[in-house]
Amino acid sequence: MKKVLLFALIFAGICSFTIKIQQDKPPILVKENSISYLYGSKALKTEGSVSKQNGNFMRFSGPATMEWSIQVPAAGTYEVQLTHSVKTAADGNSVTIATGNSTVNYTLVPTQGVFGTGSYERILLKDKLELKAGTQQLTLTVPATAKGPVMDLRAVELVPVAGKAAIQADERQAIRSRASTEWLAKAGYGLMFHYTSQSVSRDGSKLPYETAIDQFDVNKYAEMVEQTGAKYVIFTIGHAQQYCPAPIASWEKAHPGMTTKRDLIAEIANALNKKGVKLILYMHSLGTGNFGKVDNPEFYKTFTDILKEFGDRYKDKVAGYWFDCWYQIFEGYPDIPIQDFFKVCKTGNKDRIICLNSWIYPAVSPWQEYWAGETTSPVALPKNGTIERGAGMGLRYQSLLIMEPYWVQDKAAMPPPRFTAEQLSKYIGECMQQGGAVTINMGIYQDGTVDEKALQVMKDVAAKIRK
């Protein structure tokens, strides 16, 4: 990537700004029947007090400009949505979005959602843009009068007025196609386990992955889960390294040498199901489909071949999927056939539910049933089972907490639980009253056991919630 960095001094060194030009960025094709997303990573130029942050968003701390090159097939009118976060808004802080002679202005106000003031929210702006046919530049400007911090920007979204009916019809179809999530709400709470190739034994040593899978005591594990009162488990398949604890041919094809002879997935599903506990599988979507290493069609085929085999093999033994990394996938492969993906996920079980993790951002698509809810700590409660604004809006509420200050137990020492039984019981109980569910990620050792202190917390939760 060729970058030109220019540094200039203004007013004798009182103020400075940086211009970043990325000359190899192709124009973004603006769609006529679906939403087009202009991410910071796709910008042709940035200038002023704006910088990219971890999580693929742009932080505006003062006056700044971003510019995208767009290719418009035919002239048309477009609504503008701003997916952004504003914690506090200084008087007069605003943004201007313009192309050619068409301009949209918006006065920034604090955004809201389950994370409180400053949550990411998708806001439809009042005015519309008139786009001419052909290649052109679209700019977003924060004026010189702005006082920081201004906002964090995820994307500018262009909604074709002529295609809005089709977009709304697709959303209605997605909602109609969803499987019931009532069982999740009735369950109230469950557990998640990041059992991965990075998990260690209690002494800090680590067995080869397949050896650890062969020695995993399924019955002891299921008995432990039963003691917690959890009614579902989210179990990790693949993570930082793409190991799968089952002999899945399509997985072996995509990730040679990273499957096992023992089908631990089936054994865990059977053991849990006998105890009235449902199994949801976590998949690291980037790694599962080799994101970034292959193009969109190959990524999609790899991923869906795996899902079809999983579906045919496990049928109703797998009640759901928790798909990670979908804001990255949707940014990298915006044309992924999401409706078809949704249908593939139902292979073998039409009632299977899925979520597409968008982290703290609004949902990437309505083609999912429940909110991934990667919150790590309690957040605002649902209303009637869902969320009214921001991340998770319109989806079944499921909040995912971490019992330890990390996801994977890759060290011998297990820190004290982050929550007491009283704290968890209060949050779970209040969520259940509003139709939501809470999942607690527990650190797990390579032998399938957990920390006794954390286990006691969950036993106490069970005594309070399941009484």
Where are these regions (language model features)?
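Mature catalytic domains of secreted/periplasmic carbohydrate-active enzymes
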Residues: 21-74, 84-467
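Bacterial Sec-dependent N-terminal signal peptides
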Residues: 1-23
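P-loop NTPase switch module centered on the Walker A-proximal segment
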Residues: 80
